[in-house]
Regions:
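Autoinhibitory N-terminal propeptides
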Residues: 1-74, 79-130, 140, 237
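Subtilisin-like serine protease catalytic core
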Residues: 127-246, 263, 267, 297, ...
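Active-site glycine-centered loops adjacent to acidic/histidine catalytic or metal-binding residues
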Residues: 145, 305, 513
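Extracellular S/T/G-rich loop segment that most often corresponds to the catalytic His/Ser-adjacent loop
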Residues: 168-187, 310-397, 401-406, 416-417, ...
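Hydrolase catalytic cores
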Residues: 210-213, 230-238, 256-266, 348-350, ...
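Short acidic, glycine-rich surface-loop motifs adjacent to enzyme active sites
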Residues: 232-234, 252-280, 303-304, 417-419
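C-terminal subdomain of the subtilisin-like protease fold in secreted/lumenal serine endopeptidases
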Residues: 261, 265-274, 292, 296-298, ...
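Edge beta-strands of jelly-roll/beta-sandwich modules across compartments, strongly enriched
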Residues: 396, 422-432
Length: 581
């Protein structure tokens, strides 16, 4: 049976096929289509799942740069002219393009029941009859983020030496060792230190995350404050303001590999995500994260994002004879963007698009592959995709590309016309709020299933945010469940509003977002692995077992009567209650 449908390889994800069909001018005006493509070199960076050996792949594609990852995944950079050759190899099982990632930008420690189990607290006598006295010693806390202010006292021991075991700066393609970091700290001033270790956290995001998970200093001490830190500063190989999923996959491969080499348990923190995908855990990024989480003594914690009130999701059910009209407001000076529509493949319906001026595309019936539709001021690329070997979901992707600089502002309408309905559920997602004008949104948005990818990965411990001052769900926090209701996400919530933590450049600051809820759970996971693995109480306390203990220990919040629910999962983090009886 042919691997081609309408001349397109079924091994390539829908968005990649559409990107390859687009002209360079169209890609240039579409952030989603251009991601992964270098216009200067005419090369693509792609994610593949494969079998066999990398050497065999390299032999068949000598012009390609192949970066093997664990578990049969790899990142490939190759000329556009060879993408079809890559898809034609029997070793290659599936191909995706990278996606852009966005950051998910003390009373809280007391509120999460962490203080009773931390070393140095008077109440730290025992946990359900077992000695606690935990600080994270003997564990690794991995921060994959924007870097870290290694000069900050939160990340230095009492003698001034570094707590950072290794720092991989992907932008510099340089790994700094503990010894190099200590030499930099011995230089005295920041200016002299940066002459030795040049890595800086420009945004401060990673420093703030690390301070919550593992900060050491003073009144704002973090959770696993004696754990060793393993830090990756995500790179941006092209002129992007945010990293991509390919950098994240390389970072995961590195930190999990180092932890296994050093035979240390590791809690990995991921405080970013994106909205592109079916939100059912089946993308290559999500399955790769699952494979990493299944490695021994590893727990991966992911924030659910800040799209809860972003009005970037619309969901509903189609019924025969009842078309649905979805209203999409586009703000002034909005550049090109894409709209994803996901449904089950067994349902069949057509699409009609109306511009703010009332012009219609006419009814667009299913036709696999790319279709070009032209307005006076925009071009719309529409792509009816196929289900993949990993998901029954079908994507209809709409990319609005301005002929000038901006999309026509005003009220756009997307009409869904049922033709054959067996299930009827549909979901539409816009890009992350940080990529859009504030006025660009669905008018009748659906707040559920607004969690970002990869928090939809089944093996991740997915964390939303609540306000510990009001004991209420934080309305910005990405909600579950995953699409079609499974898996149940988030598993739990942690404080994410006005959290005091380390500031890049020195001192402390208040931060808000699920970015800063996730590290409460990351630090807690490190403490649990110290108790279980390092202290010898349970050598298997990691991954899904650790997740189960956290879920069982989660406490209820006022106003939340049914658990699990889409807002807070099974409840709020309570570490003291999460240890086994």
């Amino acid at each position: 049976m042919s691997e081609l449908v309408n001349g397109k390889s079924q091994k390539k994800e829908n968005l990649l096929n559409l990107s390859l069909d687009a002209t360079e001018a169209e890609r240039e005006k579409s952030p989603a289509l251009q991601m992964g493509y270098d216009q200067n070199t005419k090369r693509w960076e792609l994610i593949i799942q494969y079998n066999g050996t990398v050497e065999k792949l390299q032999e068949q594609l000598p012009q390609a740069e192949i970066y093997p990852l664990s578990g049969g995944y790899a990142i490939v950079r190759l000329p556009e002219s060879q993408v079809d050759d890559l898809a034609g190899l029997s070793q290659v099982e599936y191909i995706e393009k990278p996606k852009r990632l966005y950051f998910e930008v003390n009373r809280a420690i007391r509120d999460t029941c962490i203080a009773p189990v931390q070393s140095g607290n008077q109440v730290s006598q025992n946990v359900y009859g077992r000695d606690a006295d935990l600080s994270g010693r003997g564990t690794l806390t991995a921060i994959i983020d924007s870097g870290i202010d290694y000069f900050h006292p939160d990340f230095r021991n009492a003698d001034g030496t570094t707590r950072i075991a290794a720092l991989w700066d992907q932008e510099q393609n340089r790994i700094y060792t503990r010894e190099e970091l200590n030499r930099a700290l011995e230089a005295g001033s920041r200016e002299r230190a940066y002459e030795i270790v040049q890595s800086r956290d420009v945004s401060g995001h990673g420093t703030a995350v690390a301070g919550i998970a593992a900060g050491l200093d003073g009144a704002y001490r973090g959770i696993a404050y004696e754990s060793d830190l393993l830090v990756v500063k995500l790179g941006t190989p092209l002129a992007d303001s945010f990293p991509r999923t390919t950098e994240l996959m390389r970072a995961l491969d590195y930190v999990v590999g180092i932890a296994q080499e050093w035979r240390m348990p590791v809690a990995v923190n991921l405080s970013f995500g994106n909205t592109y995908g079916s939100h059912d855990g089946t993308s290559l990024l999500e399955t790769y994260l699952n494979s990493m989480a299944e490695r021994g003594r590893t727990s991966i914690i992911v924030g659910t994002g800040n799209e809860g009130y972003g009005m970037g999701h619309r969901a509903g059910f189609l019924q025969m004879g009842r078309p649905v009209e979805i209203e999409l407001a586009v703000g002034e000076y909005q550049t090109g963007f894409g709209v994803q529509l996901w449904k089950l493949y067994q349902d069949r319906f057509s699409v009609e698009i109306f511009s703010p001026g009332g012009s219609s595309t006419g009814v667009i019936r299913e036709s696999l592959g790319a279709q070009r539709l032209s307005y006076e001021t925009e071009e719309i690329l529409l792509y009816y995709g196929m289900p993949s070997p990993y998901s029954q979901a079908q994507e209809i992707y709409l990319d609005l590309i301005p002929k000038g600089s901006y999309i026509q502002d005003g009220l756009w309408k997307i009409r869904l016309i049922p033709e054959e309905i067996r299930d009827g559920q549909y979901d539409l997602w816009l890009p992350a709020g940080m990529a859009l004008n504030r006025e660009t949104r669905f008018l009748a948005a659906s707040p559920d299933t607004t969690l970002t990818i990869p928090s939809t990965a089944s093996r991740a411990i997915s964390v939303g945010a609540y306000d510990d001052a009001t004991q209420a769900y934080a309305d910005f926090s990405g909600r579950g469940f995953a699409r079609l209701g499974h898996p149940i996400k988030p598993e739990l919530v942690a404080p994410g509003v006005n959290i005091i933590t380390a500031r890049a450049g020195g001192g402390y600051e208040a931060v808000t977002g699920t970015s800063f809820a996730a590290p409460f759970v990351t630090g807690s996971a490190a403490l649990m692995m110290q108790w279980g693995i390092v202290n010898g109480n349970d050598p298997y306390l990691y991954g899904e077992k650790l997740k189960a203990y956290l879920i069982r220990g989660a406490r209820s919040l006022p106003g939340e009567t049914v658990y699990p629910n889409e807002r807070v999962g099974y409840g709020a983090l309570c570490l003291e209650r999460s240890f086994p009886l």
